[in-house]
A protein has these predicted regions:
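Non-transmembrane, juxtamembrane loop and terminal tail segments
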Residues: 201, 205-206
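Hydrophobic, aromatic-enriched alpha-helical segments typical of multi-pass transmembrane helices
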Residues: 1-200
């Protein structure tokens, strides 16, 4: 019963994460960066608070954090030891992402904010890497292995592009990165249901 609640709540917050981000993308009118990578590498000192409108981005990040907690709780109780380390990294990644967005809303011109976003970028790359590694070891279907690998490669690619090629379109690069992060959350949500279906099938056959 408890694990079923974790599964449903995780799916609920995954859906809200995507919906709130789509709302943010729709109402966003300024050139403010929309990810930790953009906040870390791009100059945004001239952006005022009225131009930022981060409300939906904050909600999306908060729901992403809640999803990571329920994802970790589900596998901790339902499949102990399967994804404990990866879930811990995911929760840390989403926690610092949420904190970075909160700091961006109040004061984004501090050294602490710069360090925070550097940590988020590192955690994002490591999160995609560890999930791609674990899903490969678990011999998961191609979709689940391909999504984190794609996110990992694109994270490294976009980091070096934004850092070394200032003429590149930063908005397009960040939007693509955000969409891949949404796809990653979708894949984890589907993975939860796939594991539950597989477990129920084994229980039925037994």
């Amino acid at each position: 019963r408890k694990t079923t609640n974790f599964l449903h709540l995780g799916s609920f917050f995954a859906t809200l994460t995507i919906l709130f981000f789509l709302c943010y993308s729709y109402v966003k009118t300024s050139h403010a960066p929309s990810s930790a990578l953009g906040w870390l590498l791009l100059d945004h000192s001239d952006i005022t608070e009225t131009e930022e409108n981060p409300f939906f981005l904050i909600l999306s990040s908060l729901c992403g954090l809640m999803f990571s907690v329920y994802f970790g709780a589900y596998f901790f109780h339902r499949h102990p030891g399967t994804l404990n380390e990866a879930s811990g990294v995911l929760i840390a990644f989403k926690t610092f992402s949420f904190l970075a967005i909160l700091f961006y809303s109040f004061n984004h011109n501090t050294l602490f904010f710069f360090i925070m976003n550097g940590l988020v970028v590192i955690l994002s790359i490591f999160t995609y890497f560890i999930f791609s590694l674990i899903f490969s070891q678990m011999r998961c279907p191609l979709f689940f292995r391909l999504v984190p690998v794609t996110c990992f490669i694109y994270s490294l690619f976009s980091f070096f592009v934004l850092a070394l090629i200032p003429l590149a379109n930063p908005s397009t690069i960040q939007v693509a990165g955000n969409l891949l992060d949404m796809l990653f959350i979708v894949s984890l949500g589907v993975f939860m249901w796939q594991r539950k279906k597989k477990q129920n099938k084994k229980h039925f056959e037994a």
